[in-house]
Curated annotation (Swiss-Prot):
GO cellular component: plasma membrane
Keyword match Cell division: yes
Source species: Tropheryma whipplei (strain Twist) (Whipple's bacillus)
Annotated membrane topology: Multi-pass membrane protein
Keyword Repressor: no
Matches recorded under InterPro entries: CrgA (IPR009619)
Gene (UniProt): crgA
UniProt-annotated location(s): Cell membrane
Name of protein: Cell division protein CrgA
Length: 69
């Protein structure tokens, strides 16, 4: 018996890990900027909600990680 492999259809596109790691990195940088600048960056108008925004961006990257093959 021969098995058919469809590796190209099962693997993620090349851009997938780039976006995934980019989201996690962006969220981490967002949080570091918030703490280093004492809330003056990246969005001073939203205050401590910047932490939730950063976690949301990081979690989007982790959600993509669950689909990575």
């Amino acid at each position: 018996m021969s098995r058919k492999k469809h590796e190209s259809s099962e693997n993620n596109p090349v851009w997938f890990p780039t976006i995934m790691f980019g989201l996690m990195g962006t969220g981490a940088v967002w949080m570091v900027l918030f703490y280093i600048s004492n809330g003056a960056l990246p969005l001073p108008a939203v205050g401590t909600w910047n932490i939730l925004i950063a976690f949301g961006i990081i979690m989007a990257g982790f959600a993509m990680m669950s689909r990575w093959k």
